[in-house]
């Protein structure tokens, strides 16, 4: 929903039954109108701003996108009750994001990723290890392979319990929440 004087919001989850995954495929970025509008803008930026400023395409982390499609409370419940279905959804999302990364690479862009729902305060380190780390790792590695650039990542909240995962990502920048002791982050993460 796009209110005239407010921020957009999702009225109800798109995925109410995981049976829809049987018919879902990763988004074809070459045929998706909305993504093609982005591609046109990226083309202009790459020609006009190249070598002036760093260019990055912003993508959502797979877990946050899954929460937008399923609803946060339902996704968190299903991580316990239907983990195999959550993994199926995350795989489709990750494949779509890989296509977006390929497109960004065509324009010499790096990748900035935010995954606010992957906050350990919401999911804890064990769920992070199972449902976030493998997909984010896959995307950060893929970004370096396709773009030659490491990822800028933003993580909300108290992330101390997942630092052992964050250091394994291919990152050029890590944006942490204001509650984090930055001196400690420099010492432990770099």
Please name every model-derived segment.
Residues 7-11, 27-190:
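Active-site loop segments of alpha/beta catalytic cores
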Residues 24:
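Acidic/glycine-rich phosphate/pyrophosphate-binding loops and surrounding catalytic core
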């Amino acid at each position: 929903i796009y209110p005239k004087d407010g921020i957009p919001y999702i009225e109800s989850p798109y995925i109410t039954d995981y049976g829809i995954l049987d018919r879902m495929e990763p988004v074809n970025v070459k045929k998706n109108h909305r993504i093609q509008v982005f591609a046109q803008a990226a083309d202009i930026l790459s020609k006009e701003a190249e070598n002036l400023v760093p260019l990055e395409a912003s993508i959502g982390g797979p877990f946050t996108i899954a929460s937008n499609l399923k609803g946060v409370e339902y996704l968190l419940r299903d991580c316990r009750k239907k983990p195999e279905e959550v993994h199926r959804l995350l795989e489709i999302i990750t494949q779509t994001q890989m296509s977006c990364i390929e497109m960004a690479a065509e324009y010499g862009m790096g990748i900035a990723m935010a995954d606010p729902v992957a906050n350990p305060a919401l999911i804890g380190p064990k769920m992070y290890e199972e449902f976030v780390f493998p997909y984010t790792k896959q995307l950060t590695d893929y970004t370096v392979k396709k773009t030659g650039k490491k990822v800028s990542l933003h993580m909300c909240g108290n992330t101390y319990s997942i630092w052992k995962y964050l250091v394994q990502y291919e990152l050029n920048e890590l944006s942490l929440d204001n509650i984090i002791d930055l001196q400690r982050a420099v010492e432990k993460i770099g």
